[in-house]
C-alpha cells in the first residue's frame, strides 16, 4: 500500500476522502494553491508542495520505483546546480526554525534566541515537535497499525461511530476507519499515513457529504495545520457555536451531526481545537472563539451561512486570560485577525501609541491622526477588565498607530510600513462591513444576512430606523462603528485623496444621526447619586459593559458610555464645519440637533474618571474657550465657523444670493457673528490669565495632593514640579496662540472673499473698501499669532490635521497685498509674508500635503517680488501663480481643497 506525506494528506485527501481518481487529485492540488499568495514572501512552501504533488502522483502509478525520466531530469538539474554554484560560498541549511519564524514564514538562523526574534522583541522558543521528512518506514507503520488495531475495536468505538456504521443505506466509509487508525498513531508516525482511499470507488456526492467526518483532523500537528485554509472553517464554527443558528442545515447537508464539527468544538474532550494555533508568545490562546467573527474570504456558494455583524461581537464572552501572555487583554477580539500581519507585542505598542500624549502637563495626542480623545485610556489598557470593543475599532486604532510608529518592524525594510498599513486597512474595512450594522443582541434572526438580501432593505443599516432594531440597548457596539469611520476618514483626509474621505465622513455623520448621538439618553431606571458611586463607575467593567448584554431598552447606561457618545458627536460636529470650509460644502450636522446635549467635559477629568454632576454642565454648542484640548478651544471656534459657512452659502446661492447680499438681514447676521468672535477673544484672554496665574502660584507653593496628575511619578521633587509648571505655561500659551490665529482667520472669512482668483482679479474693487482694511488688519494679526505658534510649537505638531486650511485662508490677503503692491508693501505685510512661508514649510514637514507645497511656492514667488527681485517675465510669473491657485476654488461650484 502506497504512502504519502502528511502535507499531501492535508491538502489532497482530507477534504476529498471520497475521491480516488488521479484527475480529481490533480485538480484539488491545483485548487489548494489559490491561497499561496497570502504566505510570506520568499516562502519555500510552493517548492515543497510542487515536489510533494509530483511524488504523490508518481507513487500512485508505481509505488516501488519512479520513472527513469523523472529521475534523470532531477539528477541533471541537481548537477547543473552544483556546477553553477561551485564558485559561490556554501550556505549551510539549519535543521529547524524557531516557533515564531515558522509561524511568520520568515528566515531563521537557528540560534536560541534567533536574530529575528531579538530584532522584534519576540519570545524565541523551539517547542514544536521534531518531524522527519519523507516517508515513514513500513515497519513503523505496520507496528503502529497493529498496536492501534489491538487496542481498538468495536468496543472502543464512540457511540457516534457505531451509529454511523449501522445507518441504513451503507453510509459507512473507509475514511472513517482510516481516520480512526490515524488518531491512534504515535506522534512520530504522523508524518506518513496510508492512502486507503485509492482502492475505493467514488461514491455519490450527497452520500459522501453525509458520511464526511472531520475527526481525523483533530490530531494534526502544527506543521500540518498551517496548510489548512482556516478561513474556510470559520463559518462552520459560527454555525456550531451560535445558539441562534438554525437547527436544520441547507438541503444536502442534513446528515451532519454534532461530531462532524468536533474540530471546532472546544468543549469536547480529547479534541484539538483551533485554540492550538499559537499567537505570539502565548502558550494557550484564549482568542480562538473570535476566529469565526470574520466571514470567510472564499466561502462555498452552497453554504449560505449568516455573517455576524459588529453588533454581535460582545455576545462572545471573554475567556479567562493570563496577565503574563498579553499586555493589553482588550486586544483579544482582534488577535486572530492580525496574527499574520504584526506581532502581538507590536500590537500592544501601537495601542500605547494611540493614547500617547505629547505633553506631560495636559493631554495632547502625539499622533497627528488622533484629533481628540473619545475613549478613556484606562478603560482600554486595563490589565484585567478592559472595555469590550469591536474588532473593527481595535484594528482601526492599530492602523492609525502604524501610520507614524517608529518600530523596527515597520521601518525595515522601507516598504514594510506600507504593506502592514494596507493589510490593517483591509482588515478594518472587512471587520467594519461598511453601511451594514447588525440589530440588537437577542433580536437578530438566525438567517439575518439572508433576510437583508431577500427583503431588499439594509436592515440595521441606513434602510431602517435604529430605534426599531433596539440599537440603544447596544449603543456601545454602534459607537465603536462610528469611531471606526472617524479613524478611516481622518487618515484619508490627511492624504492626497481628500475627496474620497467624504465617503467615510458621510457614513460617520449619517450613523451618528441615526443613533441620535446629539441627544442625551434618558436617565437610568435606578439612577445612582450624582457624586460618590459615579466616580468609580469608569473603573468597574461590569457596570461599564452591562449595556452590551441586555435585550431591552431598560438597560442602565453608565456615565462613561454617555460621555463617549457626547464626545463622539462633538468631534463629528467640529469636523463637519472644518471640512465644510476645506471642501466648500454646506453643513451636515445642525445646531438644532444638539441644542440640549451636554458639552464635553475636561479631558484631564475625563481620563481620571472623575465625572461631574450633569446639573453643573453647560448644554448646546459652545462659543467660549474652556480648556486645553480640542473640545476646549477648537470646538467653540467651529461653532462660530458654522454660522460663517451658512452666511457664505447664502451669499453664493444661485437664485437668492443677490437678494440676500443686498437685503438688510446681511448686516445683522454679520453683527451677530462678530459678537460671538469678540466673546471668544475675551474668553481666550481670561483663560490665559486664569491658568498662567494659577500655575505661577503652584510653582511657588506645590500642591500637597494634586487632584489631576495623570502622568506624574509617585515621588515629586521641586525641580520636577517647576518643569511641569513651566511646560504647562508653555502649553497654555500655545493653545492661546492657536486660538488667536484661527479667530483672526474667522474675522477674515466673515468680512472678505474666500476664493483666491476672485481676490486677485478684484473686479468689484473690494481692495479699496473699508471692509478690506479691517480684514487686512486681521490677516496681519493672524500672521503675528502664527509667529507665536512657531515659537512654542516649531514643527506645528499640536494640531496638524486642522491647522493647514486656516493658515491658507489667512494668507490669501497677504498674497493679494504682495501681488498688487510689490515693493511698496508695508513692512508689517512683508514680515507677515515671511512668517507665512516659514509656517507652510513647517506644515510640509509635519503633515505633507500637495496644497501646502503648492502655496509655499506661490508665496515664495510673491515674497521675492516684494523684496525687489522682479523677474524679467513678471507677467508670466503672475499668470503661473493664478493657474496654480485656480486648482483650489471657493466659488459656487468650487470644491476647495478636494481636487477631482
Swiss-Prot record:
Compartments it resides in: Nucleus
Induction, as annotated: Expressed in presence of xylose. Repressed in presence of glucose through the action of the creA transcription repressor.
Annotated region (Disordered), positions in chain: 53-75, 137-169, 520-559, 701-722
DNA-binding region: 98-124
Compositional bias (Low complexity): 712-722
GO CC annotations on file: nucleus
UniProt keyword annotations, A-Z: Activator, DNA-binding, Metal-binding, Nucleus, Transcription, Transcription regulation, Zinc
Disruption phenotype: Reduces growth on birchwod xylan, while growth is unaffected on D-xylose, xylitol and other carbon sources like D-glucose, L-arabinose or L-arabitol.
Sequence ranges of Basic and acidic residues compositional bias: 531-542
InterPro entries attached to this UniProt entry: Transcription_factor_dom_fun, XlnR/Xlr1, Zn2-C6_fun-type_DNA-bd_sf, Zn2Cys6_DnaBD
Pfam families linked: Fungal_trans (PF04082), Zn_clus (PF00172)
MF GO annotations: DNA binding; DNA-binding transcription factor activity, RNA polymerase II-specific; zinc ion binding
Family annotation (PROSITE patterns): ZN2_CY6_FUNGAL_2
Start-end of Polar residues biased regions: 53-71, 543-557
A GO BP annotation: xylan catabolic process
Family: Belongs to the xlnR/xlr1 family.
Function: Transcriptional activator of the xylanolytic system. Involved in the regulation of extracellular cellulolytic and xylanolytic genes and in the regulation of the intracellular activities of D-xylose catabolic genes in the pentose catabolic pathway (PCP) in response to the presence of D-xylose. Binds to the DNA sequence 5'-GGNTAAA-3'.
Listed name of the protein: Xylanolytic transcriptional activator xlnR
Amino acid at each position: 500500500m502506497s504512502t504519502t506525506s502528511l502535507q499531501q494528506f492535508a491538502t489532497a485527501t482530507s477534504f476529498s476522502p471520497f475521491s480516488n481518481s488521479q484527475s480529481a487529485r490533480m485538480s484539488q492540488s491545483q485548487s489548494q494553491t489559490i491561497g499561496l499568495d497570502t504566505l510570506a514572501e520568499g516562502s519555500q512552501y510552493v517548492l515543497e508542495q510542487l515536489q510533494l504533488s509530483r511524488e504523490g502522483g508518481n507513487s500512485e502509478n508505481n509505488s516501488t520505483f519512479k520513472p527513469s525520466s523523472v529521475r534523470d531530469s532531477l539528477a541533471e538539474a541537481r548537477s547543473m546546480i552544483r556546477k553553477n554554484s561551485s564558485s559561490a560560498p556554501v550556505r549551510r541549511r539549519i535543521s529547524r526554525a524557531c516557533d515564531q519564524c515558522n509561524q511568520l514564514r520568515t528566515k531563521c538562523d537557528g540560534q536560541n534566541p534567533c536574530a529575528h526574534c531579538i530584532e522584534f522583541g519576540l519570545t524565541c522558543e523551539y517547542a514544536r515537535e521534531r518531524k522527519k521528512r519523507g516517508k515513514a518506514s513500513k515497519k513503523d507503520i505496520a507496528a503502529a497499525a497493529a498496536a492501534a488495531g489491538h487496542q481498538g475495536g468495536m468496543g472502543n468505538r464512540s457511540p457516534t461511530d457505531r451509529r454511523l456504521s449501522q445507518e441504513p443505506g451503507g453510509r459507512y466509509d473507509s475514511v472513517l476507519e482510516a481516520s480512526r487508525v490515524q488518531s491512534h498513531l504515535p506522534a512520530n508516525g504522523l508524518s506518513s499515513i496510508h492512502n486507503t482511499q485509492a482502492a475505493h470507488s467514488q461514491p455519490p456526492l450527497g452520500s459522501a457529504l453525509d458520511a464526511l467526518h472531520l475527526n481525523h483532523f483533530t490530531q494534526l500537528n502544527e506543521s500540518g495545520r498551517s496548510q489548512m485554509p482556516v478561513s474556510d472553517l470559520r463559518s462552520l464554527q459560527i454555525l456550531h457555536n451560535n445558539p441562534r443558528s438554525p437547527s436544520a442545515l441547507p438541503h444536502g447537508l442534513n446528515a451532519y451531526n454534532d461530531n462532524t464539527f468536533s474540530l471546532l468544538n472546544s468543549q469536547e474532550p480529547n479534541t484539538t481545537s483551533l485554540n492550538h494555533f499559537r499567537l505570539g508568545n502565548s502558550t494557550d490562546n484564549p482568542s480562538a472563539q473570535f476566529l469565526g467573527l470574520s466571514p470567510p474570504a472564499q466561502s462555498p456558494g452552497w453554504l449560505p451561512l449568516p455573517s455576524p455583524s459588529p453588533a454581535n461581537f460582545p455576545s462572545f464572552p471573554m475567556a479567562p486570560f493570563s496577565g503574563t501572555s498579553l499586555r493589553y487583554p482588550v486586544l483579544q477580539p482582534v488577535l486572530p485577525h492580525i496574527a499574520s500581519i504584526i506581532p502581538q507585542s507590536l500590537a500592544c505598542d501601537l495601542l500605547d501609541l494611540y493614547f500617547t500624549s505629547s505633553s506631560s502637563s495636559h493631554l495632547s495626542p502625539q499622533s497627528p491622526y488622533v484629533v481628540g480623545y473619545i475613549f478613556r485610556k484606562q478603560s482600554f489598557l486595563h490589565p484585567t477588565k478592559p472595555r469590550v470593543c469591536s474588532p473593527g475599532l481595535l484594528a482601526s486604532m492599530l492602523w492609525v498607530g502604524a501610520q507614524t510608529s517608529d518600530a523596527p518592524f515597520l521601518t525595515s525594510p522601507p516598504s514594510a510600513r506600507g504593506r502592514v498599513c494596507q493589510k490593517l486597512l483591509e482588515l478594518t474595512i472587512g471587520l467594519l462591513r461598511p453601511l451594514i450594522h447588525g440589530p440588537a443582541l437577542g433580536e437578530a434572526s438566525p438567517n439575518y444576512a439572508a433576510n437583508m438580501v431577500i427583503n431588499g432593505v439594509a436592515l440595521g443599516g441606513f434602510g431602517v430606523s435604529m430605534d426599531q432594531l433596539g440599537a440603544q440597548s447596544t449603543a456601545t457596539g454602534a459607537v465603536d462603528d462610528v469611531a471606526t469611520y472617524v479613524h478611516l476618514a481622518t487618515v484619508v483626509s490627511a492624504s492626497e485623496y481628500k475627496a474620497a474621505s467624504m465617503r467615510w465622513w458621510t457614513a460617520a455623520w449619517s450613523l451618528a444621526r441615526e443613533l441620535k448621538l446629539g441627544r442625551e439618553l434618558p436617565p437610568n431606571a435606578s439612577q445612582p447619586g450624582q457624586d460618590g458611586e459615579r466616580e468609580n463607575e469608569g473603573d468597574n467593567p461590569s457596570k461599564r459593559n452591562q449595556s452590551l448584554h441586555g435585550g431591552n431598552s431598560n438597560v442602565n447606561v453608565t456615565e462613561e458610555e454617555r460621555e463617549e457618545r457626547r464626545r463622539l458627536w462633538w468631534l463629528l460636529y467640529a469636523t463637519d464645519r472644518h471640512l465644510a470650509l476645506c471642501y466648500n460644502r454646506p453643513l451636515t450636522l445642525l445646531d438644532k440637533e444638539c441644542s440640549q446635549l451636554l458639552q464635553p467635559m475636561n479631558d484631564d477629568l475625563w481620563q481620571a474618571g472623575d465625572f461631574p454632576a450633569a446639573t453643573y454642565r453647560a448644554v448646546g454648542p459652545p462659543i467660549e474657550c474652556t480648556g486645553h484640548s480640542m473640545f476646549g478651544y477648537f470646538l467653540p471656534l467651529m461653532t462660530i465657523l458654522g454660522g460663517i459657512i451658512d452666511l457664505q452659502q447664502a451669499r453664493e446661492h444661485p437664485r437668492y444670493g443677490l437678494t440676500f447680499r443686498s437685503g438688510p438681514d446681511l448686516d445683522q447676521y454679520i453683527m451677530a457673528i462678530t459678537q460671538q468672535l469678540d466673546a471668544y477673544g475675551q474668553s481666550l484672554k481670561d483663560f490665559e490669565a486664569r491658568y498662567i496665574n494659577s500655575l505661577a502660584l503652584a510653582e511657588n507653593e506645590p500642591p500637597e495632593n494634586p487632584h489631576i496628575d495623570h502622568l506624574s511619578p509617585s515621588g515629586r521633587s521641586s525641580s520636577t514640579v517647576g518643569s511641569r509648571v513651566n511646560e504647562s505655561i508653555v502649553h497654555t500659551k500655545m493653545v492661546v496662540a492657536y486660538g488667536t490665529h484661527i479667530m483672526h482667520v474667522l474675522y477674515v472669512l466673515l468680512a472678505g472673499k474666500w476664493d483666491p482668483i476672485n481676490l486677485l482679479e478684484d473686479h468689484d474693487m473690494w481692495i479699496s473698501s473699508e471692509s478690506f482694511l479691517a480684514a487686512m488688519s486681521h490677516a496681519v494679526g493672524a500672521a503675528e499669532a502664527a509667529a507665536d505658534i512657531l515659537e512654542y510649537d516649531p514643527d506645528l505638531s499640536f494640531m496638524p490635521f486642522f491647522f493647514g486650511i486656516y493658515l491658507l485662508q489667512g494668507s490669501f490677503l497677504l498674497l493679494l497685498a504682495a501681488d498688487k503692491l510689490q515693493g511698496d508693501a508695508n513692512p508689517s505685510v512683508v514680515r507677515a509674508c515671511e512668517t507665512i512661508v516659514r509656517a507652510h514649510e513647517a506644515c510640509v514637514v509635519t503633515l505633507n500635503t500637495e496644497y501646502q507645497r503648492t502655496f509655499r511656492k506661490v508665496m515664495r514667488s510673491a515674497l521675492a517680488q516684494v523684496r525687489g527681485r522682479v523677474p524679467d517675465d513678471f507677467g508670466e510669473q503672475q499668470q503661473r501663480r493664478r493657474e496654480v491657485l485656480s486648482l483650489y476654488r471657493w466659488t459656487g461650484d468650487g470644491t476647495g481643497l478636494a481636487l477631482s
